[in-house]
Amino acid sequence: MSADSSPLVGSTPTGYGTLTIGTSIDPLSSSVSSVRLSGYCGSPWRVIGYHVVVWMMAGIPLLLFRWKPLWGVRLRLRPCNLAHAETLVIEIRDKEDSSWQLFTVQVQTEAIGEGSLEPSPQSQAEDGRSQAAVGAVPEGAWKDTAQLHKSEEAVSVGQKRVLRYYLFQGQRYIWIETQQAFYQVSLLDHGRSCDDVHRSRHGLSLQDQMVRKAIYGPNVISIPVKSYPQLLVDEALNPYYGFQAFSIALWLADHYYWYALCIFLISSISICLSLYKTRKQSQTLRDMVKLSMRVCVCRPGGEEEWVDSSELVPGDCLVLPQEGGLMPCDAALVAGECMVNESSLTGESIPVLKTALPEGLGPYCAETHRRHTLFCGTLILQARAYVGPHVLAVVTRTGFCTAKGGLVSSILHPRPINFKFYKHSMKFVAALSVLALLGTIYSIFILYRNRVPLNEIVIRALDLVTVVVPPALPAAMTVCTLYAQSRLRRQGIFCIHPLRINLGGKLQLVCFDKTGTLTEDGLDVMGVVPLKGQAFLPLVPEPRRLPVGPLLRALATCHALSRLQDTPVGDPMDLKMVESTGWVLEEEPAADSAFGTQVLAVMRPPLWEPQLQAMEEPPVPVSVLHRFPFSSALQRMSVVVAWPGATQPEAYVKGSPELVAGLCNPETVPTDFAQMLQSYTAAGYRVVALASKPLPTVPSLEAAQQLTRDTVEGDLSLLGLLVMRNLLKPQTTPVIQALRRTRIRAVMVTGDNLQTAVTVARGCGMVAPQEHLIIVHATHPERGQPASLEFLPMESPTAVNGVKDPDQAASYTVEPDPRSRHLALSGPTFGIIVKHFPKLLPKVLVQGTVFARMAPEQKTELVCELQKLQYCVGMCGDGANDCGALKAADVGISLSQAEASVVSPFTSSMASIECVPMVIREGRCSLDTSFSVFKYMALYSLTQFISVLILYTINTNLGDLQFLAIDLVITTTVAVLMSRTGPALVLGRVRPPGALLSVPVLSSLLLQMVLVTGVQLGGYFLTLAQPWFVPLNRTVAAPDNLPNYENTVVFSLSSFQYLILAAAVSKGAPFRRPLYTNVPFLVALALLSSVLVGLVLVPGLLQGPLALRNITDTGFKLLLLGLVTLNFVGAFMLESVLDQCLPACLRRLRPKRASKKRFKQLERELAEQPWPPLPAGPLR
């Protein structure tokens, strides 16, 4: 490692990002703890030495350097400072197992044109400071970015500015001279305020655009599609095929021509199919992400220019067509509104209304301002301009930095899986290699004793290595996950990362979103609770019967619906709310004649029916002047409306009851607000509060657009409560109960009200009736008092969404029973615990079941905190507000109609959580099958190893076609078909083991090999004892001394053993269906067994090709079949005894070791001491 190895994580200057760790360039999916970057540059003497070594060793080092590129870099280049590096070595360490991944990249340079880095005067701040400095970095840092490295070459060409950068997994990292480090290219929305984004609406000059393109690169998501010759070289130089080539050469030298030819043909066909599939997949992915179109951009001075989408850079201002179309980049909407279909990215099938980004000094963030951001790859269904002639959007991200680029990157560079099974499998292969070495030493000794020529000894000894280390093991293991992936696809569950299927079998906890996941998507309006003065009126079941007034107008206008092809579209709750009023949405891009100015939309009342309306005169249409769309973080939305005859416009706010009440004038909030809210939420209803506020007169739509959200959403007057019924899906309760029976924790993570979430949790069985539920309530530090934390029993009337009655709180007692306690808390409480009570957080997480009012980023944080406790975490949601959590989870399942989603490795087309147990059952089946296949491949290799060693002892071996029959006809057939067994129909409590190097697995391998060895040696010695036995001529080496009796007996017995072992390790329960359900596998076993029985009794036509000696003694043939039967019974008895008796014996001999997982340790601690502390006073 170079002395100049620089960490890429740490403090960074404003506007710049560090190297985002993780294979998908996503901090949320990061699984690394540190990254190091080392620089290397050219050295003439090292280059000469490099070529000498390669030439003297006949090019073999080139192959090694392809597998180990760091070796080649260190031999050819010398370590140097990063400022002068030509090649970089990136080392990424996994935080869980401390393993390192190495990557090498080339530093590239590019001359930057003479165009100015300053923007046009229109986009300058009032103080003259340039706002086009991408990322709004501190003054001077932008010029460092473009520098603006003056190299010796630059001097010779007139001091041209040269940019140094490198590309890693699609992302571009640039050299910052003043920081002496590489940083990910800064994005426009990083560190920039919303006002800065709005100032960019004038666009970039052509010169500035060219400079930025040199820095950001073209706006393309480039998928390399290699030619067939390139793919052939890559595939042929794979270590697997390198071992195959070595083996084929060895077999040819040993005169195994037929076997070598067949393996060569099979390997060639495999390579060709792999090349075709790889290229086809690359082409399909390239065609899927390829997006090239002509777009219109603004230029300074009011000009417009049509350019190719690949020319776009952050800072360009797009003019969006009214008919919509695909978005070629990520952009912030600064003028107009767009109706967008984001199903390809988030899985949200409902069109989303995007509104113009509000101005302000707050920083712009694509995630925070999702409702104002258009993402690359999404489809704009329609665009409407209200202020000005055009719908405008400022480009914020291009290429791989976009949302679509993130999806492609996650496919191209999936996050590495830290799974014990895969590590143990590598260790086991290494152990087999050691065994091969021991066998080689033994064979050398035996062959030397038998006076075999030296060249024959070398060939035979190396041949033993090809027997012990099974080259087909990776392919056999891959087949398991492919079968599982295919079965999931048939059930409507699509997986873009097949290796994650096995992780599904190890899930210990699953988080669920509520709305649309546990409950129905649609909501039914139960009624409205109006407010008169400071008192609630009785529930009005039909909102259309409300008198004309602020509450009715709020219900009719406070939404983000839009018309698409004459049909209202938008959030289902908004649709139901408006439908209950009977009002009709009309969108008028022209001026509203009734109001006298241009408006966003008009809500028209139904035909006047005096007998149904509590009103004296018919209602009038209401015009919407401005919308502040719903924000998950703010938990509310608002509109500004006006109508003919109104003296001043009004603002209507709709959102979380607790939050809206907090924004209202306390004099307008009834004293029984909390009790009224609880009466509905405790029954499982969803409650939304509505409030209003008169505003100063705004003469036009343009003036309304200047209003800030803080101005509109403050000092409100509470109007009433909208009560909606959100029913559980019929599949929810059975699934939750099934998970709990199998000891898989079910956790609810929702943005809904805490009381509603608790009611749903009890209704679906997350919290059983006899189990205690405790509310966790925290308060921020204030007035010199530290933050406090209280635990309040849910049965107590004191716990109503954090509002407590101190007179009754202390009188309630609960018998301590930690095993049946569940905690419920809100997002604000979760944030306080994370910040002020970090030591208590693990205990809260271990017992937490309901997490309500959680913002999207808090959902992600919760999943990550659970993973820190070493839970294998699943997450199931609809993909709308769960994107981060779905990506961060070990197994994320998005409920969507799309086949692939950016948010998760699994996408289910079924709209219920039934997919969760399906994924778990398939994961357990796949993992258990992987164990079986691995055991079988190891046993197959060891069985053949024993056969060869026995025959080597007498200076013979298996024949050419005998090897072919064993490896291709018998072993390959059963290894492929044994993986077809489907998953068990019911989830059990036991999880499949994750460790391959465990006592049960190793005991099974050892005892089965003892049995195999005993049967083969028994058959061999029985043959020697027969009166008709004629020893082979040991002076002649194999295969020239074939056929002989010893070979015939060993081959016949071992052939049966491959079938017996395949059947013995293919047990069904508890993770797979019974063996008899795998019909193709049983048919193959029956056919192959019949052929082998016929081969023993009546060799017939196969005797000659297989080089078998004819045994005429029928009694001896039956004796051989008796040995086979004994082997069959013994193998199954061994597996049965090991499955049923070994665990009990191990428990008696050695007490079960306590799990080292962090959450298990916490569970034991909580079981030994009463926790949490119940009302004895708050913790501070």
Swiss-Prot record:
Protein name: Polyamine-transporting ATPase 13A2
Effect of substituting G533R: In KRS; uncertain significance; decreased ATPase activity; no effect on autophosphorylation; no effect on stability; no effect on location
Disease: Kufor-Rakeb syndrome: A rare form of autosomal recessive juvenile or early-onset, levodopa-responsive parkinsonism. In addition to typical parkinsonian signs, clinical manifestations of Kufor-Rakeb syndrome include behavioral problems, facial tremor, pyramidal tract dysfunction, supranuclear gaze palsy, and dementia. Spastic paraplegia 78, autosomal recessive: A form of spastic paraplegia, a neurodegenerative disorder characterized by a slow, gradual, progressive weakness and spasticity of the lower limbs. Rate of progression and the severity of symptoms are quite variable. Initial symptoms may include difficulty with balance, weakness and stiffness in the legs, muscle spasms, and dragging the toes when walking. In some forms of the disorder, bladder symptoms (such as incontinence) may appear, or the weakness and stiffness may spread to other parts of the body.
Record note on what altering T517I does: In SPG78; no effect on protein stability; loss of autophosphorylation; loss of lysosomal location; loss of ATPase activity
Mutation effect (F182L): In KRS; decreased protein stability; loss of autophosphorylation; increased degradation by proteasome; novel location to endoplasmic reticulum; loss of lysosomal membrane location; impaired autophagosome-lysosome fusion; impaired degradation of protein aggregates
Positions annotated as glycosylated: N1033, N1110
GO cellular component annotations of the record: autophagosome; autophagosome membrane; late endosome; late endosome membrane; lysosomal lumen; lysosomal membrane; lysosome; membrane
Recorded family membership: Belongs to the cation transport ATPase (P-type) (TC 3.A.3) family. Type V subfamily.
Effect of E348A: Autophosphorylated but displays limited spermine-induced ATPase activity and lacks spermine-induced dephosphorylation
Intramembrane stretches (start-end): 45-65
Main function: ATPase which acts as a lysosomal polyamine exporter with high affinity for spermine. Also stimulates cellular uptake of polyamines and protects against polyamine toxicity. Plays a role in intracellular cation homeostasis and the maintenance of neuronal integrity. Contributes to cellular zinc homeostasis. Confers cellular protection against Mn(2+) and Zn(2+) toxicity and mitochondrial stress. Required for proper lysosomal and mitochondrial maintenance. Regulates the autophagy-lysosome pathway through the control of SYT11 expression at both transcriptional and post-translational levels.
SUPFAM superfamilies: Calcium ATPase, transduction domain A, Calcium ATPase, transmembrane domain M, HAD-like, Metal cation-transporting ATPase, ATP-binding domain N
Effect listed in the UniProt record for changing G59A: No effect on lipid binding
Binding site for Mg(2+): D878, D882
Principal location: membrane
Modification note: Autophosphorylated. Accumulates in an inactive autophosphorylated state and autophosphorylation is stimulated by phosphatidic acid and phosphatidylinositol 3,5-bisphosphate but not by Mn(2+) or Zn(2+). The presence of spermine results in a dose-dependent reduction in autophosphorylation.
GO biological process: autophagosome organization; autophagosome-lysosome fusion; autophagy; cellular response to manganese ion; cellular response to oxidative stress; cellular response to zinc ion; extracellular exosome biogenesis; intracellular calcium ion homeostasis
Stretches in topological domain Lumenal: 254-256, 449-463, 952-957, 1016-1048, 1102-1117
Enzyme class: translocase
Residue intervals passing through the bilayer: 236-253, 257-276, 428-448, 464-484, 931-951, 958-978, 995-1015, 1049-1069, 1081-1101, 1118-1138
Outcome recorded upon mutating M854R: In KRS; some patients manifest neuropathologic findings suggestive of neuronal ceroid lipofuscinosis
